[in-house]
Structure formats: structure tokens, C-alpha cells
Amino acid sequence: MDISRMGAQAQITSLEELSGGPAGAAHVAEFERAMGGAGSLGGDLLSELGQIRERFSQAKQELQMELSTPGDDPNSLMQMQWSLMRITMQEELIAKTVGRMSQNVETLMKTQ
């Protein structure tokens, strides 16, 4: 192999040659819109997580109220069972969602 011939084929570039110049106003506006909290995937996800947290807290408070009031009638016992089942289902759903999301993130990281 002739090193002098290989050197002639290589291009030497500087950072100034690689830069594309300043971004246009349309590109900057599009970037800002994409990175904004409202309407972005991350913002929507955080909003949904906040709503799930509120519903979960509400269900726990309802169960606490039902457990604090003594009662032997079947209606109140069924209501307590329903509240407990709802909390359990929400916990399972959250656990499965988080597990799937972390699995998807791991897959994404492995492919890059």
C-alpha cells in the first residue's frame, strides 16, 4: 500500500467547514414547538401519570373512610371489597405499564 496515495484521498475538514451556518427562524420555531411541554410525548405521559396518581390516591382515601366506619351490612362490605379490588387492579396496571416502558427503553438503547 502506498501511504502517499492514501493521504491524497483523505479529506481534511475543519469544524467551520462542517457547520451549516445559523439555523433559520422556521427551524428554530419548529424545534421550540417540538420541545414544548404541551403536546409533546413526554408532557402527555407526565400528565397521564399525574391523573393516575390522583385517581389512585382518591381510591385509597375512599377505602380508608370505609375501613374507619364500622359496619356489618353486606353492602358496605361489598363496597370495601370493590375499593380494595380497584386499588389492586390499578397497582397491577401501573406495574405492567412501567415494566413494558422500561423494556421498550432498553430495546431502544440496545438498537442504537
From Swiss-Prot:
What is one Pfam family matched by this protein? T3SS_basalb_I
Matching entries from InterPro entries are given as: T3SS_YscI/HrpB (IPR012670)
BP GO terms, sorted: protein secretion by the type III secretion system
* Disrupted-gene phenotype: Deletion mutants display a reduced cytotoxicity toward macrophages.
Outcome of substituting residue 91 to K? Complete loss of needle assembly
Top-rank taxon:
Bacteria
Q: What interactions and quaternary structure are annotated?
A: Homomultimer (through its C-terminal region).
Family per record: Belongs to the YscI/HrpB family.
Q: What does this protein do?
A: Component of the type III secretion (T3S) injectisome that translocates effector toxins into host cells, facilitating the establishment and dissemination of infection. Polymerizes into flexible and regularly twisted fibrils and plays an essential role in needle assembly.
This chain belongs to which protein, by name? Type III inner-rod protein PscI
Q: Which organism is it from?
A: Pseudomonas aeruginosa (strain ATCC 15692 / DSM 22644 / CIP 104116 / JCM 14847 / LMG 12228 / 1C / PRS 101 / PAO1)
